[in-house]
């Protein structure tokens, strides 16, 4: 078994759409307008804005993903999921670490995310990675009721 975290390529578009649609539906969440745009146009929503999308591959198959996009004061981490069959391999943590490393390299001082209180394993992952809870705030997502951040010290090395 080979697992890897790779940058999004155009040939990942169908897997990106499937991964994100599946976690929303299986979680009992509506696919909101902002979700639809991100699912249908990852290039425009993330990459063209200076963000990154990471894909977790297991034996060459896309089994997870996570995106990051610059914000006014850091980077927002979003659209993280790993298929049920690939859970337990540490891929969600590796995806989150890839986002954090890229954010540090870009000089970001803050990671921010929004999630739902029903997603207990995700919240536990974020807490274990050093994220702290924030007070509720306005959000375009109806499902978002948990807000978290992690303050970063920028990387001292440049690649």
PLM-predicted stretches and their roles:
Residues 2-4:
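Extreme N-terminal starter segment of soluble prokaryotic enzymes
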Residues 7-78, 83-85, 96-98, 102, ...:
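Acetyl-CoA-dependent GNAT
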Residues 8, 22, 40, 109-129, ...:
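C-terminal "cap" of GNAT-fold acetyltransferases
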Residues 31, 87-88, 110-111:
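A generic structural signal for short
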Residues 61, 80-97, 101-106, 117-124, ...:
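Conserved glycine-rich acetyl-CoA-binding loop
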């Amino acid at each position: 078994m080979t697992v890897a975290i790779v940058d999004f390529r155009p040939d990942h578009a169908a897997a990106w759409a499937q991964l994100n649609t599946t976690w929303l539906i299986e979680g009992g969440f509506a696919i909101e307008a902002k979700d639809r745009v991100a699912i249908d146009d990852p290039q425009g929503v993330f990459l063209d804005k200076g963000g990154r999308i990471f894909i977790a591959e297991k034996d060459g198959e896309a089994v997870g993903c996570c995106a990051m996009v610059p914000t006014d004061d850091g980077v927002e981490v979003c659209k993280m999921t790993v298929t049920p069959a690939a859970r337990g391999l540490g891929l969600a943590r590796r995806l989150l670490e890839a986002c954090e490393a890229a954010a540090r390299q870009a000089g970001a001082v803050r990671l921010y995310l929004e999630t739902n209180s029903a997603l207990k394993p995700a919240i536990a992952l974020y807490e274990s990675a050093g994220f702290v809870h924030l007070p509720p705030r306005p959000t375009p997502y109806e499902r978002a009721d948990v807000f978290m951040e992690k303050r970063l010290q920028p990387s001292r090395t440049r690649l």
